[in-house]
Amino acid sequence: MMTQAKVGLGLRREMLDEFCQSVPGAIDFFEVAPENWMTLGGKFGRQFRQLTEKHKFFCHGLSLSIGGPEPLDTRFVKQIKTFLDHHDIEIYSEHLSYCSGKGHLYDLMPIPFTDEAVRHVARRIEQVQDILERPFILENVSFYASPASEMSECEFVSAVLEEADCRLLLDVNNIYVNSINHQYDAEAFLRAMPSERIAYLHIAGHYDEAEDLKVDTHGSEVIDPVWRLLAICYQTHGVFPTLLERDFNIPATHELLKEINKIHGYQTKALQPSHRSA
């Protein structure tokens, strides 16, 4: 099993003043959406540069549309590369979804779970990796309308990773949300993911629209069933860098640190000999 006991936090602009003064030791890395920072100048731009010079950063994109029907926006990918190079960021991930098709859709749409889609996405990933000169990492996404399917979501994710020879950002909350919304076994999905492909993890809170409908909002605390899945993930696949996502209803840093330290606790427990041999 791979051991990378690190915990990160999604960086928001409203956090810049505080973290430019001091970053808590429990935060090992930050994650940002490059689209929100690439053209940032002035005070925010200077503060962001100050942080990237001193701290580890990952990037998690929003608008690449890796599964989209239109030609890949190679100009945009080159802009991403320039941003990554400038800030010395090696990790770049995106959603296994699409957000364009005769215009921008302003949402992340699920890709049909078909062999044709697997090949289509893999070809586009090869283009991206060639331009970025970095490994490309894909995230399993939450979705609410079931796409056309020749295989399960689990089989589709695994097939894309294998065909494209790329790595996985495993979002534990998305597994839980989808398991409720689409009625499958979250633990079985988690255990079926290929350990050797995992690069890092996401964990977050969600919104309970109804008993059988969960919405991935990143706007609340992580709930117990998701914490349990995280523990199972570490026991099954090993400990990986894990990012706490909190995009809305953001509490004070000391409240975020409670969840960050909880992740550290799960990592420490999973690394104990009795758990590694389980």
From Swiss-Prot:
Pfam families: MbnB_TglH_ChrH (PF05114). It comes from the Bacteria. PANTHER family: UPF0276 PROTEIN HI_1600. Belongs to the UPF0276 family. This is UPF0276 protein Shew_2240. It comes from Shewanella loihica (strain ATCC BAA-1088 / PV-4).
